[in-house]
C-alpha cells in the first residue's frame, strides 16, 4: 500500500455533531471484572460466563455516563486489558508482553514499567476489533456513542528491528499492514452506523521526550521521520467518510496514575494542520502539558476538547477553576470550537488509576455540568436503542 500525504489546509472538516462534554474512553474496571478476567485466563471460567460478566460491566459503564450527563458515551473499554487490547486480541502476530517496556513515573519519582506488545509474525486480522463493543452499546442506550481505536502511530511502538525482523525486516511493511487493518475496521464501524470514531495516539507526545526518542532509534525507528509518516498513516486510516466525526486523542501516557512524557504541543502542531481529524482531545490537566498557545495552529474548522479534569488524581477540580481555564483557551480558540473532557481515560490499563468509583463519577458529573453552564444544554439527536 502506498501512503500519500494530504493537503488539508484548503479543505473543511467540520464535525457532524458537536459534543460539549466528552469522555476519552476507558473507565475503571470493577473488582468483579478483574477477578473474572483472571479466572478466565486461568481456564477457570467459561467464555460464555466471562462474556456475561463483561456485559454487566459495560451496562454499568453506560448507566454511569448516562446519569452523569456526558453528551457522548463509550463502553468504558471494559472488554479490554489495556486501551490497545482490541488490536492485540483481534489480530494475530503479536507477543502480548514481549515488547518495549516503557517506564511510567509520577511527580514523586516513583516508577513502574509496563511490558508492551511486539510484532513477531505476519499480522492476520482474526475478527473485528471494535464491532462488538459498538453494537452492544448502540443496542443499550439512546445516547450518542463513540468507539475508540488505537492509532497506527501507537502501533509503531510495537516494532523492534531485532524481534520483529523475521516477520517484517523493515518497519514500513509492518506499518502498511497495520494501516490496512485499521482502515478495514473504520469501514466496518461506518457500515454498522458508528458516527464518532476516536483514534488514540499517546505516542505522538512520546516524540517530545528525549529518552523515548532514543528508544525509538534503538528499535530501528527514526522519530523525526515517524512524525510525518504518522500523519500520513492517520489520514489513510480514517479516509474520506462524510457524516462521521473523527477525533484524535493526545496525552503523555496514563498507567496507574503515572505518565511517561512531558512537554507542550508546540513541536507536534503539524499534527493539527496535516491530519483530517475534526476533533482533537488534548490532555491539559497540569503543567506537564504546557500552555494553550500551540492551539493557534489548529485549523479554524476543527474542535478542541480541553482535557482539564484529571483522571489520574482523586482531588476534584472546581467549576470556577475549569471555567477560568476555558476562558483562557477561548482567547486563542473561539468558545464555540471548544469542548470539555477528562484529560485521559480512567483506566488505560486494567489496573486503573488511583481513584475510586465515586471519584470517577464525581469527575464525569463535573465535566457534564460545567459544559452545560458554559455552552448551554446540548442539542443532540437521541435514538431508540436497536
Regions found by a protein language model. Name each.
Residues 3-386:
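Domain-level signal for soluble alpha/beta catalytic cores
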Amino acid at each position: 500500500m502506498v501512503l500519500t500525504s494530504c493537503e488539508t489546509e484548503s479543505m473543511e472538516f467540520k464535525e457532524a455533531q458537536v459534543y460539549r462534554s466528552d469522555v476519552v474512553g476507558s473507565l475503571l474496571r470493577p473488582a468483579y471484572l478483574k477477578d473474572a478476567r483472571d479466572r478466565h485466563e486461568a481456564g477457570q471460567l467459561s467464555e460464555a460466563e466471562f462474556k456475561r460478566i463483561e456485559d454487566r460491566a459495560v451496562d454499568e459503564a453506560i448507566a454511569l455516563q448516562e446519569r452523569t450527563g456526558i453528551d457522548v458515551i463509550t463502553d468504558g473499554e471494559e472488554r479490554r486489558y489495556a486501551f490497545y487490547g482490541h488490536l492485540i486480541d483481534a489480530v494475530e502476530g503479536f507477543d502480548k508482553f514481549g515488547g518495549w517496556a516503557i517506564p511510567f513515573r509520577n511527580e514523586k519519582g516513583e516508577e513502574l514499567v509496563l511490558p508492551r506488545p511486539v510484532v513477531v509474525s505476519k499480522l492476520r486480522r482474526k475478527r473485528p476489533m471494535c464491532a462488538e463493543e459498538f453494537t452492544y452499546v448502540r443496542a443499550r442506550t439512546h445516547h450518542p456513542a463513540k468507539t475508540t481505536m488505537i492509532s497506527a502511530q501507537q502501533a509503531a511502538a510495537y516494532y523492534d528491528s531485532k524481534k520483529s525482523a523475521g516477520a517484517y525486516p523493515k518497519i514500513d511493511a509492518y506499518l502498511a499492514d497495520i494501516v490496512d487493518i485499521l482502515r478495514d475496521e473504520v469501514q466496518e464501524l461506518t457500515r454498522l452506523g458508528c458516527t464518532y470514531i476516536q483514534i488514540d495516539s499517546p505516542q505522538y507526545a512520546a516524540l517530545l521526550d528525549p529518552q523515548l526518542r532514543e528508544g525509538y532509534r534503538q528499535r530501528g525507528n527514526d522519530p523525526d521521520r515517524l512524525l510525518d509518516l504518522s500523519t500520513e498513516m492517520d489520514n489513510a486510516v480514517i479516509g474520506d467518510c462524510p457524516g462521521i466525526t473523527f477525533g484524535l486523542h493526545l496525552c503523555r501516557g496514563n498507567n496507574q496514575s503515572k505518565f511517561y512524557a512531558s512537554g507542550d504541543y508546540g513541536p507536534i502542531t503539524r499534527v493539527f494542520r496535516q491530519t483530517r481529524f475534526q476533533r482533537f482531545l488534548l490532555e491539559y490537566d497540569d503543567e506537564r502539558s504546557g500552555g494553550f498557545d500551540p492551539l493557534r495552529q489548529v485549523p479554524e474548522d476543527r474542535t478542541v476538547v480541553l482535557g482539564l479534569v484529571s483522571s489520574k488524581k482523586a482531588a476534584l477540580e472546581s467549576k470556577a477553576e475549569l471555567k477560568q481555564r476555558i476562558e483562557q483557551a477561548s482567547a486563542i480558540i473561539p468558545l464555540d470550537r471548544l469542548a470539555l473532557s477528562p484529560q485521559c481515560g480512567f483506566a488505560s490499563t486494567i489496573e486503573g488509576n488511583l481513584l475510586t468509583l465515586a471519584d470517577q463519577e464525581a469527575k464525569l458529573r463535573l465535566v457534564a455540568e460545567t459544559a452545560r453552564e458554559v455552552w448551554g444544554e446540548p442539542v443532540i439527536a437521541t435514538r431508540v436503542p436497536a
